[in-house]
Structures are given as structure tokens and as C-alpha cells.
Amino acid sequence: MGRGAKRLLGIGLLAVVCASGFYLWSHFVYADKEVERLTAEDGTRLKFRTEGEVIQIYEDGAWQPLFVQGVNLGATVPGHFPGEFPIARDDYMRWFAQIKEMGANVIRVYTRHQPVFYSSLVEFNNKHADDPLYFIQGIWSPEEQLIEKRDAYDEEITAAFLAEIEKDVKAVYGDLEEPESPGKSSGSYRTNAGQYLLAWSIGTEWDPEMVANTNELHADKKAFAGEYFAASEGATAFEAWLARMLDRAAATEIAYGWQHPMTFTNWVTTDVLSHPEEPLFTEDMVSVDATHVRPVDWNAGYFASYHAYPYYPDFFRVGDKDGRTDTYAAYLRRLKAYHKDIPLMVTEYGVPSSAGVSHEGPLGRSQGGHNEAEQGEIDADMTKMIRGEGYAGAILFMWQDEWFKKTWNTMPMELPEDRRAYWLNVLTNEKQFGLLGMYPGLEDKLRIDGDGRDWDELDETEKTELAASVPGVESIYAAHDEAYVYLSIRLDRDFDPDKETLHIGADTLPGGNRHGKELPGVTLNEGLETLVTIGKDDETGVRIAANYDMEKRLYGFVYGMIDMSEAELADDSGLFNEWRLPLSLKMEPPDTKTAHPYENVVVGGLRRGTNSPASPAFDSLAMWQYEGGFIELRVPWILLGIADPSSLQAVSYEMPDKAFKTETIAGIRFVPWIVDKQTNAVSGLNAEEAGGRPYDLSQAPLYAWDGWETVAYTERLKTGYFMMQNAYREIGGKPKTGG
């Protein structure tokens, strides 16, 4: 054997030794950092169990009652979709520390994460052995197939779910090799995180039509008796199927010498209560009852869990006749009363800090329309409310903002759908539930506060001067990031909204308004799609040309739920409508139990204030401010008709197949002018010398930008983080009753 061959052999042996050492280290990494646990006579280990109506933790040689307080943790960051699993060790380690500092004792994950999640959690807990951070492992059901086939007993669905259950249990115990598969986690799971597990959570929110159809198709399958879990008397076919899934999870885990509490996911739509006020049949058509499943030989126990938000379904609002009833507290009380002698946990609740709204909730607990302070106050109040009603735990939705998310009233305009993760639509509330904000690229560089010094400090490549031939306007600059277009306007005098109004028209496509009351005595040779108006606080906002109005076109022209006049349909109507989003669609029998009107909300208003967290007047929804003669604002992309700024797509006037489409644009042509409120005289648009001729819009500067495939974002703990921290400290991990 030559010297080179010997050298290679030596390197190979060293690699094997190192690999073996890593394997042993990862499997027995906590050998000297073991959590206190109870070991039964048969050697089975328990750290958590259910007892009566509470969760208990084994500490100081005894079982102690524990209120489970924590957050749901997503699987992605901006610029990525969940199936890409982009979160790195450093991200997890940073987040775990922040979550622990907040006072949470648990995190919940919906699905199996990449191996780095489990190795990072074990590494973190080794540094906090006296008070580790526990986790609840969710096991994702074949959601799309369940909805499509509407039959849980379908052989492919059942086989896929059973296989996923086994894989997830093995992953937690560091015993899984999973090959790469699009949209799914994969890799070598070699870190045993089992001792930090608090519970297993099986499944996702169940489609009611699937549940009802499963029960109807398999009425003869109401019984299931497994070794560890069984269906109780009165169970439905779907509940028996769930008992089988729980039994498989238990059977897989017991092989690793551990038992942990079990639950399955449920939500208000398939709860056990009757809601006669609910207008939609599907929101109150079938129940999935946790009390119809029981542990047979599972000492760790079993509990019920629900996703419960204060604004959905509609009965929360419809049942609030006087606008003062706390329908959420009443619901929690009724749900708790039903679940006797079993712990009950809310595993999702919360409100987002978003400009957009998609459901209105009683007492201001709507799905959106809150700044970060309001979000935190509501989240903290609900946390204490859940605990006060005797629940075993409350797990907030959620830890981090998720840009890839969508919601029903903005998704028709977010096109292409597969690029949602590359920009932040602040009108899509689902994107901003987090306590950890994920902010666009200029968040820390441009503060809306009326101080232009941060504009001066911007690199020349980050801003563009827009030549403005408007008397009294010294300069206009534009900038952008993944969420907003920013504009700064410097006047040669102090801005006085009592005496003047500043308008900035935006042209992106052929068509739109070439005249209007906002253009007194002036016409344009090309139309405006949207109009930004800056004046008094109640005047400032973005409006949209009537024939471009997306709400009117979709819910008026296509669906006929609201009126769209002939005048609004015409090109160059001269009408600029309020920018609105629907909150509730028009519903009538026999499609619904009761008639329900179409409802909407104005989202085009721009709130004056400062978005600087350092300011006592901090308002995360502040969109504009002025000081003296300096005005600055930020405008959400969608309010300008931009469907995807990362690929320069604007919502088109055309609606083939009665749905929105997009057109690629060169940029946005901004057209500024000032109107004197006393004389109605126009400054700008060459009004003084036009002589009745239309203003040539091509004279206006075009703000152009390059598309992008990667995003720049910054993290910051929201105000709500600190409010939740106070709530957790007040609760102290102790349930209302000790069980």
C-alpha cells in the first residue's frame, strides 16, 4: 500500500470515528443534562401527564400543575415558502432565547421541521437545563387530499397519515432518515429531543364537509379499540378514525420508552356546541368531539385542544346584538363547561398587527386593523381570559410574521400567487400575526416622522429624485422596499393642510381618469389609476379610479353583490372611489340559514404619526407625517394597484374569466399638483400655461425599479412581545385551579 493510499485510509478512518462520535453525541447529548422525569416500573418515562382538568409536570419529585403558555412557531422566513424550510440554527437559537425570555414554557410546531430545529432545541436546552423550553409536536394530516376526497377512510389518505405519524415520532427521537421530497422536511434526524416534548398534536383544522361525508359513508365504523386509545360510546366514524391515529402515535412512541400527552387539533367550525346565530351551514354542520376518544393504557393522558379566534366564524359578531357583549369570553365558558374532567387547551388564538382587515370582531377584536400596541393588548387580555376560564393552556398564534400567507379578501389581487413570499402586502392580515415582526428592507433606514435627515443619509442607489415642475415644490424623492413605495416632498414653505391639498396621481397602465374634481380646470392626456391625497388627517389617503376599483369590479360587476353604476364602468369617469376591502359577502337563503348583507371597510386611509419604535408616539400603522415644509409618506404597494412589485406586475383592467390578471409595467409615473382650498387654483401640471390643452403625462417622471428574487428584511420584537411577557409573568405558569 502506497503512502498516499495509507494517508487516504487514515483520513477515512478518522472520518468514520468522527461520524460515529457525532452520532453518539447527538443521540446522547443530554446524558448529563437529563430533565427530571418519573420512571415507571416497566421503565417507561414520563415528564408530563394529564390529571383531571390540568396538565402536570414532574418536578422536585412530585407532579405539579402547569399552565401551558407559549407560542406557535412557523417554518419559514420572508422570501421563502414553508416547504423550503429556510430557518437556520442561528435563527432558532436567537428565537428560543427570546421566547424563553418572554416567559413562555412551550413552543408548538404544526409539522415536522428540518433536523436543525431539533438539534438547536437540544443545544439550547443544554444551556438552560434547570428550566428548559418544551415543545408540542404537531403532525400534519393530508389536508388537501382530505378536502378533495372528503373521506378520511380513503386508503391512500389513511396510509399517508399513519406513515407521517410514524415519521414524526421517529424524527423527535432522532431516528429518521428522510429523503428529499418537494415541500416536505427531510434529512438525517439524529438528535433525540424526546425529553423536551410536552405533547403530540395530531392533524389540522378539519373540513366540515369532509367530516360529515366521512361519517355518512362509514356509519358502520364508529368503534375502534386500540392498545392505547379507543373510541368511546357515541363516537362517530371520523372520531373513531382519529382514535386510530392517536393509537398509532402512542404505539410508535412507546418503543422509545416514553409517553407524552396526546391531543388532536380542532377548531370552532367543528366544535361540540350549537350556534344558531351562525348564518353559514358549513360553520355549524358537524361536530368532532374530543370526549368521544379515550386513553386505554396511556399514563401520560389525553386532552382536548382548539384553535379559537374571537372573530371567526360570524356567530361571534352576529351574536353581539348591542356591540358590547364579550362573545369570546362566553364561548370559552361554554366550551369549558362541556369538557368536564379533561384538560382543555386553546392552541391557536390572537389578532394581527396589519393595516388590512378581513373579519370584524366584537369589542374591537377584529382580524386586522390593529397597530402593534393594540395587537399586544388584545393578545395579552385573551391569554389571561383563557387562563381565567380554567383552561389548561394558551398557545398564541404566533411567533413570527409570515409573508407567504394569504387571506380571502386580498388573494384575488396578489398575482402571481407563487410570488407572495417575495413581498409584504400589509393589507393581508394573515402575514402579520407574529410577536416577532419581519419588516421590509427600509424599515430601519426610513422612519416616518417628518424629519428628512434619514432621506439625506440614504445611499443614492436607494432613492430616486423625481423632477417636479410644481411651483412651491423644491424636490420629490421616491424609494421602495418589499412593502411600500416611499415619497418625500420638500416645499419652499410650511405645509398648511387647512389651506392647501397636495395630490400625487399614479399612472401605471393605459386607461384611468384624465379629469376629475381633484383636477379643477385641468385634464390629462393619459389616465390615473390611483390618487394619493395629502391634506387634513381625514382627507389623507389613496383612492382608486372607479373603473379600476378592484372591489367594485369583482364584487359588483362580477358577483353582483354591490352596485357599480354605469358612470363607474366608463373609462375616464372622473370618479375616484375609496379604497375598500370586503369584510363579509352577501348571503341569502337557501344558501345560508339567514340573510346577511355585504359589508366592507375603507383601507385606503393613510394614518398620520410616526413608525419610529423609539418615539413615545410610536404607531406601527403610521403612513405619513409632515414637519414644516417637509412631507413624507409610505404607500402600500397594493393601494397603487401593484399585484407583485418583485416582478413589476400591476393588476390589469382586463378580467378574462371574471378574474383579475396582471400586466408587466415599466414603473409608476407620479404626477404631483397642489390645489388651493380657497381659490381652487392648481399649481403644477403646467396649469398656468396649458391654455386648455391636456397635460402630457409623459412629462411626469417615471419611478422605475428592478425586480428581485431575494428579499431584505429585518427582525424586531413588537410591542406585543413585552405585553405578553407581562401577562406570562402575571400567570407564572400556574393554572387557575391546581387539579
Specify the residue positions occupied by each region the protein language model found:
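Short, well-ordered beta-strand segments enriched in hydrophobic/aromatic residues
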Residues: 450, 484-492, 629-637
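Acidic/polar low-complexity flexible segments
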Residues: 508-531, 641-739
